[in-house]
Amino acid sequence: MADYRKTLNMPDTPFPMRGDLAKREPGWVADWQAKKLYQKVRKAAAGRPKFVLHDGPPYANGDIHIGHAVNKILKDIIVRSKTLAGFDAPYVPGWDCHGLPIEHQIEKQHGKHLPADRARELCREYAAEQIERQKKDFIRLGVLGDWDNPYRTMNFSNEADEIRALGELFRKGFLFKGLKPVNWCFDCGSALAEAEVEYQDKKSPAIDVGFPLVDNERDKLAHAFGLDTLPEQPVYIVIWTTTPWTIPSNQALNVHPELIYELVETPKGLLILAAELRASALERYQLEGRVLAAARGVALDRINFRHPFYDRLSPVFLGDYVAADAGTGIVHSAPAYGLDDFVSCTRYGMRNDEILNPVQADGTFAGSLPFFGGLSVWDANPKIVDKLAEVGSLFASGTLTHSYMHCWRHKTPVIYRATTQWFVGMDRLPGREAVEPGSATLRELALKAVDETQFYPAWGKARLHSMIANRPDWCVSRQRNWGVPIPLFLHKETGEPHPRSLELLEQVAQRVEQHGIDAWFKLDAAELLGSDVAQYDKMRDTLDVWFDSGTTHWTVLRGSHAADSQWPAALYLEGSDQHRGWFHSSLLTGCAIDGRAPYDALLTHGFVVDGQGKKMSKSKGNVVAPQEVSDKLGAEILRLWVAATDYSGELTISKEILDRVVEVYRRLRNTLRFLLANTGDFDIARDGVPVEEWLDIDHYALALTRRLQEQVTGDYARFEFHKIVQALQNFAAEDLGAFYVDILKDRLYTTKADSRARRAAQTALWHITQAITRMMAPILTFTAEEIWRVTGNDAEDSVMLHTWHELPELGASDEILARWELIRSARAEVQKVLESLRSDGRIGASLQAEVRVRASGARFDALASVGADLHFVLITSRAELVRVETEADEGVDAAPSSHQKCGRCWHFREDIGVDADHPELCGRCCTNLHGDGESRTHA
């Protein structure tokens, strides 16, 4: 038999079957940087509508982890998709550079006793080094951005503009100084922001403590309970606490005004307990008790008890925050160490200088504190319990495992500790309106802004709303060295800021703009204050790093990168923890400065967990490093994994999951390779066929592609990337692989190379390739560029310099789709029958079969519409269509062909050998080889 392979139009392409991503991707990255692709994209997009995704800055410390990779890849997908959608979508990456973690790194390397200016210099150098390390890894992921000109919160211009932002808050009255309990970390030696506190289980002592009644208050207490006199027994009001270390600082006792409290007679004396908790409390104390009387909490207001071991009073105050869900229903109040306690005591007139605060910054009691001076609060706990037992005030002692505040950096317990700090006020400022009369409070502005913001996923709105509604004032001052200063001068006697503070803030900002934050720390106050210098102290506090990142809408979008940006940003995108972090701080500063959020929408992604849903940790050995994935499988696989995962929940990753992603990629690549290989000899300008002259099935493929593009571009706009991956998979596997290109192979391979039928098919494939390449480019960016180069585009060109592909216009798409869906359903039934023949060993390939299809109604009409090309659609050597009256009569009859097989097209036909010169060929192949070529109308 002659070899007719060379007479076929065999597919050919330089696009390899194997991607070799890990080896080839670095070359693409280098190419993009060499030809300054980001700048070219900016130039191509100039004048389009802006879409600004503002980058939440990662902290400049340590290598990037898988969470960073997820975040940056999601951002890149969005920025690229918006660019392709016709927007000018710049991406300016940023870094958070100040703060304690970097200070700690410098202390580790150089010790704790460096001069402050030298420490700041080393911190700046360290942050710059870390940025370069992280930048290299982000670029390796294929993230396109202004990497040569990122924003850094330690840039002099950013530091200066942050001071100006602080000035705006000061000018509008949101900034105030006050004594309040704030989150305090002993290891940091500083206050913590809400976002720097995390909760972990902690085992704490749980004790019940009796405070004895003052002798001369017995009649008053009897009256409160409706009694004439009290029995001649000691009287205790009993509290329950898990923080014995706060007992030395007790200054009051809180009851709920509406709760019922009972006076209970026990062998140990008369006890005051909440009625709802009496039984459980007496069980803890192992005491029998008899209720003598009951009263509402309001009746106990201002009755005095005595501190268990110090000679001072502890009055009863009313507090709505007291609950009856645990303990005794009475809360001991140490106003220096609890926000509710502080509010309650100050409401009752307690002055700041009356609040007892013996715990020092390092967590030890002041040496002057009787019994416990010099001890750490944790070491003091058992000694305080012993002291309470010694004086007869310990009613019960045990332990409790509960969720407790910990420092996010040190993983050590933190406390509330009253210190004089600077706050951004959420409601009202002491002694004056928070803002100009008639305007809203910051809390009201922020809640309104939350309502006006679009959230992806939608549940984020309720979460952020709740956080804003319930949060305390924001403590923005820190007692640290490496940070943007709060450059105020405070009067030595009154503590009030200098009357020219706004003017002075701007003068400091101008100096910082030239010399960085050292300009403040090295400043001789006399240079700015003149003769006032003797009356004022220069502040040493620095700003919370969340204020650094939280004001980037001011310092970056309207500051260092204003020319490339837009305010407000279209989108902020971060992990779900940023509802209490960057989303939160940005919202507060935005509302304080501008009265609105600095973003139109917020998108949150979940955290990455291992294949079993467990949190990753080095100790568990389940960490997946993005660098390792890129080096082994390619960053493209990481990008595809991110896109294919529903990021609204936890993102699961493991070797097995990545292996499945590799398989998805392989299938997509093979489909694309087929498209490229079968358009290798095609030039759209030279060989393109007008859409009106395409075959019917090509029109169907075009309609499918248009439908896909509409879905995909819509999913990009809705940030639903996992749906895109699924849609591309289905299109490649089902619409193309299992149907269109399966049918198309005969026309592509066997018809004349330049026949209208083949060129029409190639034109359709070219448009499909163009559309898919652009649709996948935001996700599979390396592969899209590879395809772009293979399709004959100039080396200086890039898919990112274009927009979504403009598909040829086609009328009656809905009719075509509906008709061909009927044809596909009939074809599926034919394939089932053929598979049965194959299982019985009666046929091998489907071309060995001849079929008879019985159809009725719309199905018959659809099948009849393709005329004599039906057997091409069914991939059989012969197909007969018979009309029947009802669906019940429909069916498929199939049998092996009795004819010979053509040596070229492999169809079984009765006209084999009709040309004596080619006895092994069918008439169709003879026409295609030596005649004018066959005529195709539909397939």
Swiss-Prot record:
Locations listed in the record: Cytoplasm
GO annotations of cellular component type: cytosol
Enzyme Commission numbers on file: 6.1.1.5
Primary role: Catalyzes the attachment of isoleucine to tRNA(Ile). As IleRS can inadvertently accommodate and process structurally similar amino acids such as valine, to avoid such errors it has two additional distinct tRNA(Ile)-dependent editing activities. One activity is designated as 'pretransfer' editing and involves the hydrolysis of activated Val-AMP. The other activity is designated 'posttransfer' editing and involves deacylation of mischarged Val-tRNA(Ile).
GO biological process, one term: isoleucyl-tRNA aminoacylation
UniProt cofactor(s): Zn(2+)
Catalytic reactions of this protein: tRNA(Ile) + L-isoleucine + ATP = L-isoleucyl-tRNA(Ile) + AMP + diphosphate
InterPro entries, A to Z: aa-tRNA-synth_I_CS, aa-tRNA-synth_Ia, Anticodon_Ile_BEm, Ile-tRNA-ligase, Ile-tRNA-ligase_type1, Ile-tRNA_ligase, M/V/L/I-tRNA-synth_anticd-bd, Rossmann-like_a/b/a_fold
Domain observations: IleRS has two distinct active sites: one for aminoacylation and one for editing. The misactivated valine is translocated from the active site to the editing site, which sterically excludes the correctly activated isoleucine. The single editing site contains two valyl binding pockets, one specific for each substrate (Val-AMP or Val-tRNA(Ile)).
Protein name per its UniProtKB record: Isoleucine--tRNA ligase
Residues where L-isoleucyl-5'-AMP binds: E574
Residue numbers binding Zn(2+): C902, C905, C922, C925
Main location: cytoplasm
Residues that hold ATP according to the record: K618
Source species of the chain: Aromatoleum aromaticum (strain DSM 19018 / LMG 30748 / EbN1) (Azoarcus sp. (strain EbN1))
Chain ranges for the short sequence motif 'HIGH' region as given in the UniProt record: 58-68
Subunit relationships: Monomer.
